[in-house]
Amino acid sequence: MNHRRLTDLTAVLAGTAVFFTILAAAGTKKAAQAVSGTVRTAAVVCTGAFCYDAPQTLSAADFCDFDGSGAVTQGAVIGFSQLVELSVDGLQEGAGKGVANYQVLESALSFVARFTQRERYADTLFRLTLPPGIYEMDGQGEPLHLYQNTWLSMEGVTLRKSDSDCSALLRNTPSGSAYAGYEANSNLVLTGGVWEVPLEHFDARSEEDRFSVLRFGHCRNVLLAGVTVSGCVNGHHLELCGVENCSVVDSTFHGYLDTEYHGKGDKKEAIQLDVVNNRWVAPGFPDFDDTITQDVLIYGCTFRNLCRGIGGHNAVYGRSYTNLAIQHNTFTHLSGEGVYALNYAHADLSHNQMKQVAGGVTLLALTDHPDDAYYAPAQGDLPAFDQLPVQSHLLSVTDNQIEVADGSEPAITISGGVYGDAQFADSYGGRTFWIEDVTLARNQVMSGHIVQSYVRD
């Protein structure tokens, strides 16, 4: 990121026009360009542009001490050759400004999308910086939308949900859109800031209140650094649904309200890794084509006063969440597990600290009631048992410190199982789902115990 500045660009957006003045490095040539469009009350000011003589990358190593050596994944690696710096004017602090603030920020993000959707800007990263402050946000049921090649910088900023609609604060796909594979808006960066959901706006007795806060689906290269998500209502603070190459570093997740939706105890993970299988698993993210989340790094994050920390409670027969690194995180005061996961493969869980949790690490190849968690493929036939790959294997759980609140519960559970439910009994009834190639080493279990079953080399 620290490279010679080859081009200076200044611009001001006001009303319906954007004027760019490009000053070449020698300072001898000037050009002006006007781009038509409506941006409501927003003002977007271009404060600089950088062109690099070699392709650049942005990754976790730019924001924390992760160096990538020996890691099962590097997470997000975002390449670019140009960086355009933009700032937003028009956000207002104080009560009653939520709708106006939403319009300002959504308009600014949409304006950036006019450029990022064009092929000529395919290798340009646009950094949109918000001024420090606490801003109410009311999308009247609609989230903000983050588009291709956009970096939202929020140091010193709190975006506070001021409505009681069960809607996310941010997502990467417009309502009504459909994508396959990892082809939705990608190369997305969030740095700094607080995304706040005031839990007092919602009713724990409600049978309807539930939503996730930050939602990403069908995409690749998502990077969060120094982000705080405060509060979630029977959903996920961060939902990764069919995401390839993601890094979440030095971020904080806290606050959870369990409502009566599906009854109390409907356990949810703060960071969910999921598969795009159906509209119940992945609402709002068609096409439902079993695009799975893989190559994820979660490093140096804090999880407190939650249900579960990281993982997921859905899986598809024959598909695995692969290349996952969960390292150097802290989990405290959880009513569920620090990590709860199905069908993980090539996963490294190391140097995490868990204290006052209901369970530490739970990695499963089959649950006790698989019909509640495992699905047939969205497309094609259910795989025959002898054609299934090993769904959970190459798991390393090392150098963790775990203190379970109730010492009678397991600190670490590594388990396969025997299928005994009804839905897929013809194909899988009585068959054993094994976990293979597990490494447990140097874990300090201060309370609780270790369970391994249906595990083999």
Put a short name on every predicted segment:
Residues 155-158, 183-197, 220-231, 244-259, ...:
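Right-handed parallel beta-helix
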Residues 22-42:
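Sec-dependent signal peptide cleavage junction
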Residues 2-14:
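N-terminal Sec-pathway targeting helices
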Residues 39-106:
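Right-handed parallel beta-helix/beta-solenoid
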Residues 106-121, 136-148, 179-182, 218, ...:
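Short, T/G/N/S-enriched strand-turn elements that build extracellular solenoid repeat scaffolds
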Residues 48, 62-66, 93-103, 151-211, ...:
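Right-handed parallel beta-helix/beta-spiral solenoid domain characteristic of secreted/periplasmic
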Residues 117-118, 139-142, 161-167, 199-205, ...:
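Short glycine/acidic-rich loop motifs that flank beta-strands on beta-rich extracellular proteins
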Residues 102, 106-109, 121-175, 195, ...:
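N-terminal extracellular ligand-recognition/capping segment immediately after the signal peptide
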